Amino acid sequence: MNITLRAGERLFINGAVIRIDGKASIELLNEVTFLLENHVMQTEEATTLVRQIYFAVQIMLMDPAAAGSAAPVAHSLVESALSAYRTAELAAGLKGVAASLVRGRNFEALKALRGLFALEDKELQLGETPSAA
């Protein structure tokens, strides 16, 4: 897999933080856990259930030492979201996220969660479910 980074951009690989001085292309030759800086969610952005799940999974990717404590939180939040949300498409996506987490495919779960943001926003705008506390 090839990743192109801009000057000053950070890349998180297996818990390590790498900052690039100039534009660079990196080729990952084996399977690693990585996260691009532009996909990193800040704490204050985790305002809904799906975003809180994303944040918990993000912690698992960025800090492997914290994965053991973040994983049960992520699973619990998925269960809460499945109970709270009504749309079939959102529920199916959350079930896929849960399956990815069980298989240890955290990056796959994170990618799926990004795709659920718009569905969650739509459901919240309809006023059918509350946002997370």
Label each PLM-derived region with a short phrase.
Residues 1-27:
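Short, charged/polar N-terminal "headpieces" of proteins
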Residues 20-47:
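Short, surface-exposed, low-complexity cationic segments
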Residues 46-49, 53, 70, 93, ...:
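Helical mechanochemical/support elements of P-loop NTPase systems and associated helical scaffolds
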Residues 47-65:
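Charged, amphipathic alpha-helical linkers/stalks
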Residues 53-57, 76-77, 96-97:
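A general alpha-helix detector
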Residues 59-92:
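Mid-chain, well-packed structural core segment of small domains
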Residues 79-133:
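C-terminal charged interaction modules
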